[in-house]
């Protein structure tokens, strides 16, 4: 998918400023109490998602996250298909006071072992 220059600049800034968690660490972090938060649209979530993950679409994140995850100290692993929406969501959560918000580097595709073909796939901050 081709993104607009402004959208990609926002996503790149989020990727640079929020920690990307390697997919090999996701299951361990979730087992230790982290919440995997699927921020894709409901239709995407219904097709596939990380087992046990919560769902809150990116478009409703700011309105619904406080009811869904009231603890500002909670470790939250935002994810989408690749990187952009996950990183943008983690950045938004940090602005809202969720200091342990991160994103899953490579998103669901990487978690499932699929190659990340997004243009910023090699820019993930670990």
State what each model feature region is.
Residues 1-35, 42-75, 81-126:
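Rhodanese-like catalytic fold shared by cysteine-dependent sulfurtransferases
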């Amino acid at each position: 998918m081709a993104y607009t220059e402004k959208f990609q600049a926002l996503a790149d800034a989020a990727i640079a400023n929020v920690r990307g968690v390697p997919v090999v660490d996701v299951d361990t972090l979730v087992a230790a109490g982290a919440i995997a938060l699927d921020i894709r649209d409901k239709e995407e979530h219904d097709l596939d998602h990380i087992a046990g993950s919560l769902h809150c679409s990116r478009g409703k994140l700011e309105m619904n996250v406080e009811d869904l995850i009231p603890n500002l100290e909670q470790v939250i692993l935002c994810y989408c298909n690749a990187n952009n929406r996950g990183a943008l969501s983690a950045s938004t959560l940090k602005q809202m006071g969720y200091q342990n918000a991160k994103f899953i580097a490579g998103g669901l595709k990487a978690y499932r072992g699929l190659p990340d073909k997004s243009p910023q796939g090699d820019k993930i901050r670990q």
